[in-house]
Amino acid sequence: MSTSKLVVAMDGPSGTGKSSVSRMLAQRLDARYLDTGAMYRIATLHALRKGVDLTDPAAIADATAGLPWSIGTDPAGEQVLLDGEDVGEEIRGDAVTKAVSAVSAVPAVRELLVAAQRRLAGEAERIVVEGRDIGTVVIPDADVKIYLTASAEARAQRRNAQNLAEGRGDDYAAVLADVQRRDHLDSTRAVSPLRPADDSVLVDTSELGIDDVIGRLLLVVSERTGAGQ
């Protein structure tokens, strides 16, 4: 396998298997892994803990300006800290999930975190960067750009199954409504709306297992760069 510099931009909406796929792809490529969505979730948790009015962009910007956070890039395990506390589980909770679109839409928050994302990606020799605007905004010159997609129904089924596995109850209708709500917010926001880059490779995961997805992506990386095989 080539050990040359490699940046893979992995974009797409929630529920496409993006996080699991990105971690596994990074491991197969002997690369680092950056979950930019976790960064926005850390900022959201911080704003919630501060009691910030989430309808006030200026207040959100002020609260997150000195965000005391850190995030690891080891694909074998997540490390996300807020004020030195491991918040990996808390940032995946319902409160953060419902609020993250509002926080991530604030231009000052995006500016702060995009700068950090570029720095972390630049420090790595090889890295898979996962998010929603990596190929369009954060790293538009990435070596490989991939956009994972799936139907809203397939994504809701996956998230509902995850909720059941984690003991959060069975409410497919509510999960589907939330998926559709987030899709609308993310695709219509003024700053960095969710969309594939013009030169992204689109992969629909609705009917694919994770091994099938990884196989396709390794082929894409190999075709684009010569790495991955």
UniProtKB/Swiss-Prot annotation:
Disulphide linkage map: none
Record's GO cellular component terms: cytosol
InterPro entries, A to Z: Cytidylate_kin, Cytidylate_kinase_dom, P-loop_NTPase
Catalytic activity: CMP + ATP = CDP + ADP; dCMP + ATP = dCDP + ADP
E.C. number: 2.7.4.25
Protein name from the UniProt record: Cytidylate kinase
Family classification: Belongs to the cytidylate kinase family. Type 1 subfamily.
Keywords, in A-Z order: ATP-binding, Cytoplasm, Kinase, Nucleotide-binding, Transferase
Subcellular location: Cytoplasm
Lineage: superkingdom: Bacteria
MF-aspect GO terms: ATP binding; CMP kinase activity; dCMP kinase activity
Chief place of localization: cytoplasm
Keyword Nuclease: no
Keyword rRNA-binding tagged: no
UniProt: ATP binding residues: 12-20
A single GO BP: pyrimidine nucleotide metabolic process
